[in-house]
From Swiss-Prot:
Catalytic reaction(s) noted: Hydrolysis of terminal non-reducing N-acetyl-D-hexosamine residues in N-acetyl-beta-D-hexosaminides
UniProt-recorded name of the protein: Beta-hexosaminidase
Family to which the UniProt record says this protein belongs: Belongs to the glycosyl hydrolase 3 family. NagZ subfamily.
InterPro entries per record: Beta_hexosaminidase_bac, Glyco_hydro_3_AS, Glyco_hydro_3_N, Glyco_hydro_3_N_sf, Glycoside_hydrolase_SF, NagZ_Beta-hexosaminidase
UniProt pathway: Cell wall biogenesis; peptidoglycan recycling
Organism encoding this protein: Stenotrophomonas maltophilia (strain K279a)
Keywords from the named record: Cell cycle, Cell division, Cell shape, Cell wall biogenesis/degradation, Cytoplasm, Glycosidase, Hydrolase, Peptidoglycan synthesis
Ubl conjugation as UniProt keyword: no
A biological process from GO: regulation of cell shape
Residues given in the record as substrate binding sites: 60, 68, 133, 163-164
Main localization category: cytoplasm
Length: 335
């Protein structure tokens, strides 16, 4: 299955045709798709109306610098700001993370989307792409926050996606623009980077997004192209039974597999359930690539959002304003 990107704030005729394709599981929205709260709500409805089957509509609404929808939405702080509170008051910090998750997820669901790809459970160890998106450099601290964040998302009826497996935080390179190689052995990764993923799986996380990082001591290809990582370690060793997403095949580090068809097939052959094709100019080629493949069409049904309030109901809910106030009082910033 594919999650695709669309070009603008309204669907084009070509994009409506794409949504008819059996392999299209849904759409990932970005800043380019956002003009206002009402517009993105209308776009979500248009996507569903254009497709003959349920569509999974997604966004990256983590907070901090990775927040695609801003005007009309809470200005969510980065996870690192919450993580910094853990040293002085762990219980308050974890409660705040759960509230952050509730606020983020409730606003995304009120806009007609199903999920935000969250939480980031990479360790905060200097990676250019991760930075303050991570809670902490300490695996046990990140593990505790991961469980809290999953609970907060689930309380709104949003599925939780752990990313980026098996851990993107220790390499320096940004896989959007560079190849990234992590030379560590599997035992070290088990003791460090895998710890938050184990906690998230135990907390009932619904999906995992793979990293485009290469771990040559474990497998020669990026993790998202690796049956060793997906089938043997994630599913076999860690017991994960949910949905496995690739990261975007438009990222530079994904090009090692070859052209667009080769990238799509490499992800699916390795065990990914869903391949992200976020750049609209790659969608036609990706759709041609999956013709004739057996696709796991049932995998995504459990990720469809449940129980949205709608914006009127959400703004009338005392928890919305109270959560904004708690974040403001605790972190000293307007949300």
């Amino acid at each position: 299955m594919l999650l695709i990107g669309v070009a603008g704030t309204e669907l084009t005729a070509q994009e409506r045709d794409w949504l008819q394709h059996d392999a299209v599981a849904g759409v990932v929205l970005f800043k380019r798709n956002f003009a206002s709260r009402q517009q993105v709500t209308d776009l979500s409805a248009a996507i569903r109306a254009a497709a003959p089957r349920p569509q999974l509509i997604c966004v990256d609404q983590e907070g901090g610098r990775v927040q695609r929808f801003r005007e009309g939405y809470s200005d969510l702080p980065p996870l690192q700001d919450i993580g910094a509170l853990y040293a002085t008051d762990p219980q308050q910090a974890l409660a705040l993370a759960e509230r952050h998750a509730w606020l983020m997820a409730s606003e995304v669901r009120a806009s007609g989307l199903d999920l935000s790809f969250a939480p980031v459970v990479d360790l905060g160890r200097g990676n250019r792409a991760i930075g303050n998106r991570a809670f902490s450099e300490d695996p046990q601290v990140v593990a505790a926050f991961t469980a809290a964040y999953v609970r907060g998302m689930h309380s709104v009826g949003m599925a939780a996606t752990l990313k980026h497996f098996p851990g993107h935080g220790t390499v320096l390179e940004d896989t959007h623009v560079d190849t990234a190689i992590d030379p560590r052995a599997l035992d070290e990764l088990r003791a460090q980077d895998l710890v938050p993923f184990q906690a998230g799986i135990a907390a009932g996380a619904d999906a995992v997004m793979m990293a485009h990082v290469i771990y040559p001591q474990i497998a020669p290809e990026p993790a998202g192209y690796s049956p060793r990582w997906i089938q043997d370690i994630l599913r076999g060793e860690l017991g994960f039974r949910g949905v496995v997403f690739s990261d975007d095949i438009g990222m530079a580090a994904s090009h090692s597999a070859g052209g667009v068809p080769a990238r799509v097939h490499a992800h699916l052959d390795a065990g990914c359930d869903v391949v992200l094709v976020c750049h609209p100019e790659l969608v036609d080629e990706a759709l041609h690539a999956v013709q004739g493949r057996s696709l796991n069409t049932a995998a995504l049904l459990g990720l469809i959002g449940r129980g949205a309030l709608g914006w009127d109901g959400l703004l009338a809910d005392a928890r919305h304003g109270d959560t904004q106030t708690r974040l403001l009082e605790t972190l000293g910033r307007t949300v």
